[in-house]
């Protein structure tokens, strides 16, 4: 990192929403901006909370399972309290530690309660992807854990959720014939369910959705590639992890965003 402060990492004056912003507008903004979180502020720019794509989609999903409401769903119904904030004078290590300790992906930067900016896990990954930090050019192969049992593409979404809970992972590879064809995470599952049209048979239709309809097809890494390349892949495809295969395209394991961020934390002072 070129500086000792957060200035090279923070997105200043980030897009923000109000409590009255509708769910449709929230989802449109998130898709257009390629983000999964938006800060909620009052008229004076004071931070009220954070709204996430996951929370919005879950609320939409609940509405689809019951009779349609007259009033549109708004941010005030899904806004979450802020687990942590930081000031503009903080050091990068403080911000990254807060993100990892709280298991969150975005950290508001405040001054006197007013929103100045946002720093995210992707901002730190991007810094790591430049390959200038110690360890960022290590080979992927030295950082692989024993692979978790992957999913088959014809598994149901419920089976995928159960598998994630059982192994304690928030993402799993989807493998066919020993070769990975994609990755699935909780947000992918919720997105797939919300794509189902409303109607009397919707709940039954949702239960038949297969992992192949929810997964993201992504390029795999080779064991000899560098960790900074893994970070770049995660940023480009907005992934929580990267899949690693051998030359025969056989599944070897996964490398998570949190693993790379943990390495980065140990290097920061």
Regions found by a protein language model. Give the residues of each.
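Tandem CBS (Bateman) regulatory domains
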Residues: 1-13, 52-83, 96, 100, ...
């Amino acid at each position: 990192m070129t500086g000792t402060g957060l200035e090279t990492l923070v997105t200043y004056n980030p897009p923000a929403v109000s409590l009255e912003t509708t769910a449709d507008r929230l989802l449109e903004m998130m898709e257009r901006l390629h983000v999964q979180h938006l800060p909620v502020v009052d008229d004076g720019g004071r931070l009220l909370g954070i709204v996430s794509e996951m929370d919005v989609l879950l609320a939409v999903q609940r509405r689809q399972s019951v009779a349609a409401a007259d009033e549109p769903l708004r941010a005030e119904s899904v806004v979450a309290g802020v687990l942590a904030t930081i000031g503009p004078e903080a050091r990068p290590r403080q911000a990254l530690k807060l993100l990892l300790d709280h298991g969150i992906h975005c950290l508001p930067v405040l001054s006197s309660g007013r929103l100045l900016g946002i720093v995210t896990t992707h901002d730190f990954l991007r810094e790591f992807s430049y390959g200038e930090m110690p360890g960022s050019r290590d080979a992927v192969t030295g950082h692989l854990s024993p692979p978790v049992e992957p999913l088959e593409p014809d598994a149901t979404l419920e089976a995928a959720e159960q598998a994630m809970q059982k192994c304690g992972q928030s993402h799993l590879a989807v493998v066919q014939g020993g070769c990975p064809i994609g990755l699935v995470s909780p947000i992918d599952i919720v997105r797939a369910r919300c794509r189902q049209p409303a109607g009397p048979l919707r709940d039954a239709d949702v239960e038949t959705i297969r992992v192949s309809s929810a997964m993201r097809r992504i390029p795999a890494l080779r064991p000899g590639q560098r960790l900074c390349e893994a970070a770049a892949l995660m940023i480009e495809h907005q992934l929580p992890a990267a899949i690693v295969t051998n030359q025969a395209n056989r599944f070897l394991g996964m490398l998570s965003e949190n693993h790379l961020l943990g390495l980065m934390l140990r290097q920061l002072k």
